């Protein structure tokens, strides 16, 4: 059973990432691959975008975490994902799974369910619509974006967490993170994160980095989620207008690189539901 310690030190997990410099093996999408690599570096971890089916089985053992994102899936990606997931599960390397577009495309939904059923996934991270879709609810999606209000998302999170024995993160206006019978709400962030492509993918690989550096997946996942929200807030504070989206995107990397454990601790807004 998971427990939530309201006094846990968010900043400890950022410090661990920077001390351990975990290697994150990412099989991710082409749209946001560069953003994922840069946010990982800014946080203090090391990314590797190794996706060839001829290489992944040899590369996974070198990593501390595996991040799977199906945003631009193709057959070679599928082959590589299965090989990587098998090796990671064999070696007990944590897997973070981002079911991008599963709400809109049945073949993606089938792939994600198969991975969850057959491999040891440490965390599922998706928007409200994707998470509800995985649980068999009707989610409303427009392409890769969520249009779902997620009124019952806490219950859905709990069902998925217990079914697949994994941590579940549903992102939205507030982010809900569930493991077993415990759900916490992260209230950091800004609507501007939803106006640039890649913010969700960056969060997914950050979770991978934080989990890869820690023995406590639960608290590390929470800390990673807070980190992304906090640097989003800082980036918004650094621009002159809400239309400065290019500057906002760059500022995310700047503030992640400069983020201190003290700032993360002081600005984190986490509560148990």
Swiss-Prot record:
Entry keywords, A to Z: ATP-binding, Kinase, Magnesium, Metal-binding, Nucleotide-binding, Thiamine biosynthesis, Transferase
CDD domains xref list: THZ_kinase (cd01170)
Residues given in the record as ATP binding sites: 125, 171
Cofactors that this protein relies on: Mg(2+)
Enzyme class, first EC level, given as a word: transferase
InterPro entries in alphabetical order: Hyethyz_kinase, Ribokinase-like
Binding site for substrate: 49, 198
Domain of life the protein comes from: Bacteria
Signal peptide: none
Keyword field contains ATP-binding: yes
Physiological role: Catalyzes the phosphorylation of the hydroxyl group of 4-methyl-5-beta-hydroxyethylthiazole (THZ).
Family statement: Belongs to the Thz kinase family.
NCBIfam families in the cross-refs: PRK09355.1 (NF006830), thiM (TIGR00694)
Name of this chain's protein: Hydroxyethylthiazole kinase
Organism in which the protein naturally occurs: Natranaerobius thermophilus (strain ATCC BAA-1301 / DSM 18059 / JW/NM-WN-LF)
Lineage: Bacteria, Bacillati, Bacillota, Clostridia, Natranaerobiales
Name of encoding gene: thiM
């Amino acid at each position: 059973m998971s427990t939530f310690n309201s006094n846990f030190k968010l900043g400890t997990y950022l410090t661990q990432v920077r001390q351990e410099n975990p290697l994150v093996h990412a099989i991710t999408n082409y749209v946001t691959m560069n953003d994922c690599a840069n946010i990982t570096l800014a946080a203090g971890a090391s990314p590797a975008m190794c996706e060839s089916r001829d290489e992944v089985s040899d590369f996974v053992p070198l990593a501390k975490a595996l991040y799977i994102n199906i945003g631009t899936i193709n057959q070679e990606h599928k082959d590589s994902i299965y090989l990587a997931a098998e090796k990671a599960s064999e070696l007990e390397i944590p897997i973070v799974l981002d079911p991008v577009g599963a709400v809109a495309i049945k073949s993606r939904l089938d792939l994600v369910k198969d991975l969850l059923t057959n491999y040891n996934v440490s965390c599922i991270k998706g928007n409200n619509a994707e998470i509800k879709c995985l649980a068999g609810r009707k989610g409303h999606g427009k392409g890769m974006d969520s249009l779902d209000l997620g009124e019952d998302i806490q219950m859905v999170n709990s069902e998925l967490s217990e079914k697949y024995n994994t941590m579940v993160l549903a992102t939205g206006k507030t982010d809900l993170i569930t493991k077993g019978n415990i759900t916490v709400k992260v209230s950091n962030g800004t609507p501007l994160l939803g106006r640039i492509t890649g913010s969700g993918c960056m969060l997914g690989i950050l979770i991978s980095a934080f989990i890869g550096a820690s023995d406590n997946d639960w608290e590390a996942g929470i800390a990673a989620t807070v980190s992304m929200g906090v640097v989003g807030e800082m980036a918004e504070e650094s621009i002159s207008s809400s239309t400065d989206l290019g500057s906002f995107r760059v500022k995310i990397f700047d503030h992640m690189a400069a983020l201190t454990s003290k700032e993360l601790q002081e600005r984190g807004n986490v509560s148990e539901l």
